[in-house]
């Protein structure tokens, strides 16, 4: 299965009539492996800061998580494994695997829990596959 198929079929799938706004699978180096059409353009520095928060949990808390034009307030995640952010009625979930970051961005009517489930389920699967 191609990386694009993982994004299209596993991240952008419909859940209870809703789906993510955008999603991507990005290497630890910031290289995009696959993304949905609406995924924001981001700076390498933004991916570097996300990776730093996985190594040093809490790194992003004072400044927020920036991805493209959006700043998310970092909320409770799982240190070293999952970063979650909130902005208004939407947010972001980032799951770290051995080689990649699985990223999902949502807005209402999708809920934070639905986003977490979709992103973390694929991330856990990739971890099980040695990715």
From Swiss-Prot:
Q: How does it assemble?
A: Occurs in many kinds of cells as a complex with monomeric actin in a 1:1 ratio.
Q: Please state the protein's primary subcellular location.
A: cytoplasm
Q: Which Gene3D superfamilies match?
A: Dynein light chain 2a, cytoplasmic (3.30.450.30)
Q: Which Pfam families match?
A: Profilin
Q: Source organism's superkingdom?
A: Eukaryota
- An example molecular function term from Gene Ontology annotations: actin monomer binding
What name does the UniProt record give this protein? Answer: Profilin-9
Query: PANTHER family in the record, alphabetically?
Result: PROFILIN, PROFILIN LP04
Alphabetically, which GO biological process terms does the record hold? nuclear migration; regulation of actin cytoskeleton organization
Q: How is it modified after translation?
A: Phosphorylated by MAP kinases.
Which keywords label this protein?
Actin-binding, Allergen, Cytoplasm, Cytoskeleton, Disulfide bond, Phosphoprotein
User: Membrane-crossing residues?
Assistant: none
Q: Provide the family line.
A: Belongs to the profilin family.
InterPro entries (alphabetical): PFN (IPR048278), PFN_euk (IPR005455), PFN_sf (IPR036140), Profilin_CS (IPR027310)
Taxonomic source organism:
Zea mays (Maize)
One cellular-component annotation, GO: cell cortex
Q: Where is this motif: Involved in PIP2 interaction?
A: 81-97
Query: Which cysteine-cysteine pairs are annotated as disulfide bonds in the entry?
Result: 13-115
Task of the protein: Binds to actin and affects the structure of the cytoskeleton. At high concentrations, profilin prevents the polymerization of actin, whereas it enhances it at low concentrations.
Q: Where in the cell is it found?
A: Cytoplasm, Cytoskeleton
In this UniProt entry, the residues modified to Phosphothreonine are: 111
Q: Supply any other comment.
A: The variability of the residues taking part of IgE-binding epitopes might be responsible of the difference in cross-reactivity among olive pollen cultivars, and between distantly related pollen species, leading to a variable range of allergy reactions among atopic patients.
